[in-house]
Amino acid sequence: MPIHQVTANLMPLIWPEAAPLLQKAIDLDPSAITIEQVEYGIRRGEYSLLVWEEPDAGITGAVTVSFQDYPMHRVAHVHLLGGKGVVKKHVFEEAMQWMRMHGATKAQCWCQDNLVPMYEKMGMTNTHKVMRIEL
């Protein structure tokens, strides 16, 4: 079950399958981003789009990732994650290997409290709380 990075030239072929998977993640907080903004960010290179396939099932999952450089770390930030099998160890291991190949030393994501258990199953730990105020 390989993970593939989707390059801009493959977007017309892959996006119709990946978009509904990512939309499920967007639906958890529709005020944060739209699927059109995600597509634009991928095409501009702000986010990388990864998809994974299952034999005889085709594309079953998608994730968007960006990289943030800090003095001590290069962080792979997962923005959206959707589809089947996202908590399977081999899926997460392959995604982490891709992140390492791109220089990341840590991976992170922001999520609502109800998703913390899912990410903990993947081996992630809850390290911060994000506080926000409207300006």
Where are these predicted regions, by residue range?
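Short amphipathic alpha-helix that is part of the acyltransferase structural core
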Residues: M1-I33
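N-terminal start-of-chain detector that recognizes signal peptides
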Residues: P20-A25, I35-E36, L50-E54, H79-L80, ...
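Active-site rim helix/loop that mediates acceptor-substrate recognition in acyltransferases
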Residues: L28-Y47
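Short, flexible, glycine/charge-rich loop motifs used to bind or transfer phosphoryl groups or to couple energy/partner
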Residues: E39-Y40, S66-D69, Q97
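Conserved donor-binding loop and adjoining core beta-sheet/short helix segment
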Residues: R44-V86
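Short glycine-aromatic motifs
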Residues: Y47, K121-T125
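Acyl-donor binding region in acyl/amide transferases
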Residues: H73-M122
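Conserved catalytic-core motifs of GNAT/GCN5-like acyltransferases
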Residues: W110, T125-L135
